[in-house]
């Protein structure tokens, strides 16, 4: 039997997860930039497809961000199957955040010894989506970075 507190935590988790999936799913196929740096992801993917290097000395044509290239290679692999646009980058970010939520659940559950605390940690992380600027589903390296930091 669930206590009132545990029921409230579970309901909160499912509400926050549903809101995240609803919002991220609605923004996944939006054909334009949701944020000013999202367009740079497409520029990086174009450079990958053309076989041009990322990390060169800054010029007027190209000044690279100091981001790890792994995200762009993953997006490029997805881009091969999905097609051009923001979908591949946003999909990588959404999957990364969902994997982070699952990792948070596992870490806190194992550390505290109770499932409900893992659910609470996952719910609190999902609750930060809007207050943190709704960046978790953008075609940017940040979500994959958060996943790898949590995994470490």
Feature locations, PLM:
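Start-transfer (signal-anchor) and selected internal transmembrane alpha helices
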Residues: 1-24, 109-110, 115-116
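Helix-to-loop transition at the C-terminal end of transmembrane segments
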Residues: 19-39
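Extracytosolic helix-loop segments that constitute the early lumenal/periplasmic catalytic or substrate-binding loops
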Residues: 22, 39-63, 70
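Juxtamembrane segments of multi-pass membrane glycosylation machinery
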Residues: 50-52, 70-95
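Transmembrane-helix motifs of polytopic, lipid-linked glycan transferases
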Residues: 91-112, 151
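Transmembrane-helix signature of polytopic, membrane-embedded enzymes
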Residues: 102-127, 146
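Specific aromatic-rich, kink-prone transmembrane helix
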Residues: 124, 131, 144-152
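Short acidic/glycine- and proline-prone juxtamembrane loop motifs at membrane-interface regions
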Residues: 134-142
């Amino acid at each position: 039997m669930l206590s009132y507190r545990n029921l409230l935590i579970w309901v909160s988790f499912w509400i926050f997860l549903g809101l995240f999936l609803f919002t991220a799913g609605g923004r996944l196929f939006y054909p334009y930039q949701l944020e000013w740096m999202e367009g740079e992801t497409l520029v990086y993917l174009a450079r990958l497809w053309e076989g041009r290097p990322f990390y060169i000395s800054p010029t007027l044509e190209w000044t690279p961000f100091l981001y790890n290239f792994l995200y762009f290679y993953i997006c490029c692999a997805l881009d091969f199957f999905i097609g051009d646009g923001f979908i591949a980058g946003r999909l990588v970010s959404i999957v990364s955040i969902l994997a982070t939520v699952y990792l948070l659940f596992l870490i806190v559950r194992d550390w505290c010894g109770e499932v409900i605390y893992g659910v609470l940690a996952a719910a609190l992380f999902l609750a930060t989506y809007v207050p943190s600027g709704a960046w978790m589903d953008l075609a940017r390296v940040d979500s994959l970075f958060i996943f790898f930091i949590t995994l470490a």
